[in-house]
Amino acid sequence: MIENSDYMELSFKKPSKNVREAMCQASLDLGNREIETAHKRNAEESLKDLTHHQHARIVNSGNSAIMIAMSNIKGPVLLPDQGVWAGFKKIAEFLGLKIEYLPTNQGIIDLEILDNYIKITTPESLFITSFAGYMAEQPVKEIFELCDRRGVILVEDASGSIGDPQKNLACGDHAHIIVASTGSPKIINLGNGGFISTNDPEIFKKSNYILKSSRISPVICAGMVEAIKKAPYSLSKTLQACNFLKKEIGTVLFEEYRGINVTLPSENPKQMGRELRKRIPVEGGGMISTCPRYDRIKQPAVCLEIKNLDIKCLKKDNLREISDITNNITSNYFI
């Protein structure tokens, strides 16, 4: 259930109290090799339990995790034409990998089109995000089954879906490799770091130098153990909040899909975004983004980035006020 509140007070997501306390304690233990090693080991074991993968490594960013995954691939790399992290393209270009783009339905992958494009482009890998543009859940299990049959490595960026209670997303049963950022304001929110998990240990052997160059502080590892415990709750509350807003706001995209933001079509997204930012302030950050943009959707729209908000803000009265303000402003901008 979504909780009640007396008034709207929104704040940008930050690491939880338990996470901050664990990180503070770990900082006091710096220099003790035995304790530092234990923090790293415990975090990696927690990640393996969460992802259902046999191997996991914690690194200094989500992009480092992507770099490790791509360094094991000779190409071509298949990317959706929208709705995925722009870092996929930049890192593939940096590594000199050939990129092919998969046509999608507003970021959502159609399995028949995917099958045809695999036959045409013969990619070695497909990189996706669990939610297309954070907006709509991809059919990850079905994508994985198709890729597995065709000999294509599926890499899932699960930054926004880790801890999925339904086990459809961020699950090693449905991805050859999982990568994620644990920076702010991700589901596992440590303000820094990332991870990569897989059942194939050769991936880490082949990228040993990058792994060494991407080592993370044991302070982050200590925080990760605590943050992982809260990941299913954090994701569930965010999904519930988005589902509530999709029902309350007049016109939204992907109403029937799970997602961690709410996207509104608009004839003038920049102006509409400015008005929403004025009326829906967020302490310490923001929650409004505008499209078209590759990592969301390639059409004029405004996104309410509910994923950016601290979980404590996702109370019914806050959400109702967000929906009322949004409905009032957006009536002049819907396409």
Name every feature range the model reports, one short phrase each.
Residues C221-K237, G250:
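Amphipathic alpha-helix from the class-I
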Residues M1-N18, A22, Y294-I335:
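PLP-dependent enzyme catalytic core of the Aspartate aminotransferase-like
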